[in-house]
């Protein structure tokens, strides 16, 4: 696959990226959410756009070329976000490409999905299968499915944590504020079946803004962070389900196109960074297949501690 996006569809009235140095992880794959966000930055006045990818190098290079043809200063960055040495090696390169400074906005979008499996449930039996064959099949499925879940969780959780540690550290050291935007999913708070690694990974990153603030302490004014919970967007990973309302119907009349999701994100990011800081924002989809209406809401993840009557009545005393 190569670059196929319509650049003009990503031109929006909002000025969220104007004059900013923007780095987007997981933005190389054609037709992906990351690509949409990178194009939104490029088409709406970003000073520099960093397009990160790991394996989607052909799509990524083609997109960077398209941006440059439109007069945008853009560069490609290849790295494994779960490899700390890879990321550290990219640091000086990114700063060089951004004319001696770190990014103003870091959008963490790296992530994978799962093909789906019967989490916590036994595999159905196959007629005529011997006990030995079933045991071998169950073992293989167990190993392969959990390996996939681990990769999904590592890519999202480790990737986001590593990028945050790297660029927050640069921001604090150089006294230059940075804004982190973490791309999560509606499934983080409304889990779907068969994709446990994906759900857990997207839930975990919702805590990152608070974790960052707590660790920065007095320097927390140098880095702000928020999480975006997106509904289903039609990408290479979701294309096969685009016509299946059983997959997305509880949230939306149809899957969003990447430029629609990018427009909504651009609208949200046009708000002041301190207004968005520590927030978890959910993108709702209303309307019909022919005409959708996208609206943001803020999700409060509050911890409520309730006493247990039986324990109050019989505490353990020592």
Could you describe each region identified by the protein language model?
Residues 2-5, 150, 223, 227, ...:
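C-terminal helical subdomain
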């Amino acid at each position: 696959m190569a670059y196929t996006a319509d650049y003009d569809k990503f031109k929006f009235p909002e000025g969220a990226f104007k004059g900013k140095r923007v780095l987007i992880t997981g933005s190389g794959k054609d037709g992906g959410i990351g690509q949409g966000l990178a194009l939104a930055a490029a088409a709406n006045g970003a000073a520099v756009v960093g397009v990160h990818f790991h394996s989607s190098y052909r799509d990524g290079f083609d997109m960077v070329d398209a941006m440059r043809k439109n007069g945008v200063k853009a560069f490609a960055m290849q790295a494994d976000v779960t490899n700390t040495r890879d990321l550290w090696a990219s640091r000086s390169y990114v700063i060089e490409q951004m004319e001696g400074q770190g990014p103003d906005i870091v959008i963490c979008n790296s992530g994978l999905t799962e093909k789906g499996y019967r989490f916590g449930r036994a595999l159905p039996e196959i007629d005529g299968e011997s006990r030995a064959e079933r045991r071998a099949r169950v073992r293989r499925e167990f190993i392969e499915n959990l390996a996939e879940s681990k990769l999904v969780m590592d890519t999202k959780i480790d990737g986001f944590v590593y990028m945050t540690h790297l660029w927050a550290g640069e921001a604090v050291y150089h006294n230059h504020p940075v804004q982190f935007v973490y791309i999560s999913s509606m499934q983080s708070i409304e889990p779907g079946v068969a994709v446990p690694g994906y759900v857990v990974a997207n839930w975990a990153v919702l805590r990152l803004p608070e974790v960052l603030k707590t660790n920065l302490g007095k320097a927390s004014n140098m880095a702000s962070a928020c999480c975006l919970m997106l509904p289903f967007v039609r990408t290479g990973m979701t294309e096969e389900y685009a016509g299946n309302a059983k997959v997305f119907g509880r949230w939306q009349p149809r899957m969003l196109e990447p430029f629609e999701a990018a427009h909504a994100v651009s609208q949200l990011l046009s708000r002041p960074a301190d207004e968005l800081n520590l927030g978890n924002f959910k993108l709702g989809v209303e309307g019909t297949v022919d005409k959708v209406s996208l609206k943001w809401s803020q999700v409060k993840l509050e911890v409520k501690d309730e006493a247990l009557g039986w324990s109050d009545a019989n505490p353990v005393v020592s």
